[in-house]
């Protein structure tokens, strides 16, 4: 796992070069948006249960076969596993937002997840849809302007969305 600062230093070291002006400017922008980044993480963390529950509810309304007898989320144990996995993905998305880097999401959550789901017979397309539903809910909550640092958050919302897209692609 690398945060944005460590990643820049590592890349410069690999090149055998000083940190470039462009890299410094990018890090300055990230620091300037630090309060917004923390607001996003706090909003998502504070509403994690709601985000997961609403995404699961919407998924099961669209794909009722998942919760029907014989479905992959049928029985309380399977449903609990589904919700747990969605919550884990959401948690790692917040880590990526906080760090400003997707490596924690990739390294500790997504690598090998598709293969695990395939081995267990979990429908990756359904998990991917659930992740997209979490994305919609999380962005709506994170983008609510009341009680947070003012300013343009479009870049941060795009970054947040990209982490969900990355997760959806990894499992789909």
Curated annotation (Swiss-Prot):
Function according to Swiss-Prot or TrEMBL: Light-harvesting photosynthetic bile pigment-protein from the phycobiliprotein complex (phycobilisome, PBS). Phycocyanin is the major phycobiliprotein in the PBS rod.
Pfam families listed in its UniProt record: Phycobilisome
Residues reported to bind (2R,3E)-phycocyanobilin 2: 153
Species name: Microchaete diplosiphon
PTM annotation, UniProt: Contains two covalently linked bilin chromophores.
Protein name listed in UniProt: C-phycocyanin-2 beta subunit
Record's subcellular location: Cellular thylakoid membrane
Keywords annotated in UniProt: Antenna complex, Bile pigment, Chromophore, Electron transport, Membrane, Methylation, Photosynthesis, Phycobilisome, Thylakoid, Transport
Subunit record text: Heterodimer of an alpha and a beta subunit, which further assembles into trimers and the trimers into hexamers.
Encoding gene (name): cpcB2
Residues annotated to bind (2R,3E)-phycocyanobilin 1: 82
CDD domains in alphabetical order: PC_PEC_beta (cd14768)
